[in-house]
């Protein structure tokens, strides 16, 4: 078994290379052992539309049943429907088989104990159980239950649009296609849907809305029909991408500004959490609207647990994970987030660009990934942090964000790749270039 499949936020690898039926059965046994030690036995299993997911369901369930778990199989569904089932069916945990937004040859597993997603050391504990080879034994069971209709009804009862909205959605042949078009039409929207048929080969484009290339068809259709908004979902519908009528991509931190204003209107002083990669505009706007913005570590599991700790009503990431604890359960759900966006649009005659038109103009880079071996990346970031700490104010909850009066630069170690991640923002293109050069030159000096 390749230990590298146990990642920071989930378990994932290449089908038949890292993930075999035997490895998946062991995962099922390890999960059963881990959760039984906590006195929990009633769990859920769901899966995405990847070609290998039905196959992996068999050994996963066998392993879990051999450990005495009572399983409800909810079939093919988006990841947020799996999270919803933990509340709706009142289960004590579960496993979602999903490769999320990774290429077709990948698959993976998101693991929940109680209502929480495992991350970090807890995921490594599953690996340690497999390596020790001592598994819980018992006589489990499997039953089947359809949860998608209950999920759709829940959202329809909790979302209210003031007028009909014309929009385009692109499910990227992922699982959102089985759920989102119906909800949006039942809300009264005029929906043009692209690639709603689930197909694990992803024949039209890769299901990752953070990459502009994958949004081209959505942008073209929004412009062609004159839609108010375009919404793209990733492969398992826990991340959202948004396009405005002129065809600009609204990144996660801008989207969070719209959601934050709405939440703060109803809950003055609320706490809102985002990550170190986000624009200064977001934190300034939260403060301007009377909220408490917390800059936290990147990574959806880390953000979710920080939200619980701070009793935050809203959280979000650049990557499009949006977490609503306001009127919802606090997990990342791109379908629910799109409904909340439509609520905002339905209550105004302003367009998306007009709603964001009062933000100060800034210039930023996308995330820049610089290859750096896993065994060196944390030490390098630490040295960069110590070097800048002497001269500039910094934020160091995750790597180092160096603060300037008119911009910032971020250097952090990637949680998922052998790389360091850089991002820069400034008030002018010239200043952006200067900040970037200053920080990149410092990294070069330190890594000599």
Where are these regions (language model features)?
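N-terminal small/polar loop signature for handling phosphorylated ligands or for N-terminal nucleophile
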Residues: 37, 42-106, 182-243
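An N-terminal, well-structured beta->alpha segment
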Residues: 1-62, 66-68, 144-166
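Gly/Ser/Thr-enriched, mixed-charge loops and adjacent short helices
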Residues: 105-225
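Phosphate-binding and adjacent anionic-ligand microenvironments
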Residues: 265-423, 428-448
